[in-house]
């Protein structure tokens, strides 16, 4: 298949592109290199995909690119591109979130509608659409009440996907990711920050009391869900939770990191941040039903992989 991966230089996009290439597909990757974090990190993420002669890359923003040309001959679209970050989505920055997350998605859907050859459009949604949930595990039918401007834009884009499916039969699938982690995780995300702090012998900063819980999902499980969403006909039109299968406190995460790092860990507790939810925990029965999805990587295994990755990149920085 000929695949388009948007946000290909990012955390999920780069892993997904590598998997598609290894599976024998042709991949066109697009990325705008938005300055949310260092471009050099994204360039490093692209080293794997760029080693394949079946990979091509276009730098540009989906708002401005000629999408008719971009989608010509494409079978599968994996729409991972977004302006990320819950805490940064307040205030004047919201305009960027609406442009990158809502308007870009609408342009992609409209072009897919008129392009004619798209077999699947998989949208990377987010658990942020649920907001501060009150009952667990969270079902896809649970109340959607985003707790941040970022969550509002992710829900708006997801709703657009659903609308284009029901009105025009654009073959969309929306996957609601729950806290994805692993090698190449963005530097602003908690596990990356935790690993870096340990390596620098600095205290880990936790916002709130550490008893907040998350359903953490390892990157390879998220990639597998995307592949299955592209290949399972029954998935078309569905919205599904993609999660790791366990509810863990941040204090438990610290204990695991101390074990995998072999280093004592110091922690400081700070005020809860605007937009941060207290708990997440997903019901993934729908993904099991339609995708035969079942997460394979335990938190212990995944954190060990992420810590090894962090150790490799920050060792290089120190010795450079």
Over which residues does each language-model region extend?
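N-terminal Rossmann-like NAD(P)+-binding domain of SDR-like oxidoreductases, especially those catalyzing
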Residues: 1-176, 220
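Hydrophobic "lid"/C-terminal helical patch
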Residues: 16, 226-230, 257, 303-310
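A short C-terminal helix-loop "cap" of Rossmann-like NAD(P)-dependent dehydrogenase/epimerase domains
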Residues: 47-53, 168-169, 195-206, 260-270, ...
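Residue-level signal for the nucleotide or nucleotide-sugar donor/cofactor binding architecture
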Residues: 100-103, 148, 185, 189, ...
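Glycine/proline-rich active-site loop of Rossmann-fold NAD(P)-dependent oxidoreductases
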Residues: 155, 180-193, 200-202, 207, ...
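C-terminal "lid/loop" region of Rossmann-like NAD(P)-dependent oxidoreductases
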Residues: 209, 237-240, 249-255, 262-279, ...
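Non-catalytic, hydrophobic alpha-helical segments
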Residues: 222, 226, 242, 253, ...
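Amphipathic terminal alpha-helices
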Residues: 299-320
């Amino acid at each position: 298949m000929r695949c388009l991966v948007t946000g290909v230089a990012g955390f999920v996009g780069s892993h997904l592109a590598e998997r598609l290439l290894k599976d024998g597909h042709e991949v066109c990757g697009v990325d705008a290199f938005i300055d949310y974090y260092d471009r050099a990190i994204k360039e490093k993420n692209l080293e794997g995909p760029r080693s394949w002669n079946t990979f091509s890359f276009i730098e540009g923003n989906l708002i401005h690119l000629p999408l008719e040309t971009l989608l010509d001959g494409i079978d599968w679209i994996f729409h991972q591109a977004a302006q990320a970050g819950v805490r940064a989505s307040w205030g004047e920055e919201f305009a960027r979130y609406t442009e990158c997350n809502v308007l870009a998605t609408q342009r992609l859907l409209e072009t897919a509608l008129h392009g004619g050859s798209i077999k699947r459009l998989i949208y990377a949604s987010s658990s942020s659409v649920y907001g501060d949930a009150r009952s667990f595990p969270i079902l896809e039918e649970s109340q959607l009440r985003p707790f941040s401007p970022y969550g509002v834009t992710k829900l708006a884009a997801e709703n657009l996907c659903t609308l284009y499916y029901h009105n025009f039969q654009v073959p969309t699938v929306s996957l609601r990711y729950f806290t994805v982690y692993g090698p190449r995780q963005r530097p602003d995300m908690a596990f990356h920050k935790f690993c870096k702090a340990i390596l620098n012998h600095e205290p880990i900063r936790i916002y709130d009391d550490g008893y907040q819980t998350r359903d953490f999902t390892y990157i390879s499980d998220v990639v597998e869900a995307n592949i299955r969403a592209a290949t399972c006909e029954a998935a078309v039109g569905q919205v599904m939770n993609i999660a790791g299968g366990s509810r863990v406190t941040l204090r438990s995460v610290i204990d695991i990191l101390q074990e995998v790092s072999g280093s004592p860990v110091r922690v400081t507790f700070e005020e809860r941040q605007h937009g941060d939810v207290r708990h997440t925990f997903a019901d993934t029965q729908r993904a099991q039903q339609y995708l035969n999805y079942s997460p394979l990587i335990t938190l212990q295994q995944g954190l060990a992989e992420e810590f090894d990755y962090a150790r490799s990149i920050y060792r290089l920085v120190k010795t450079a």
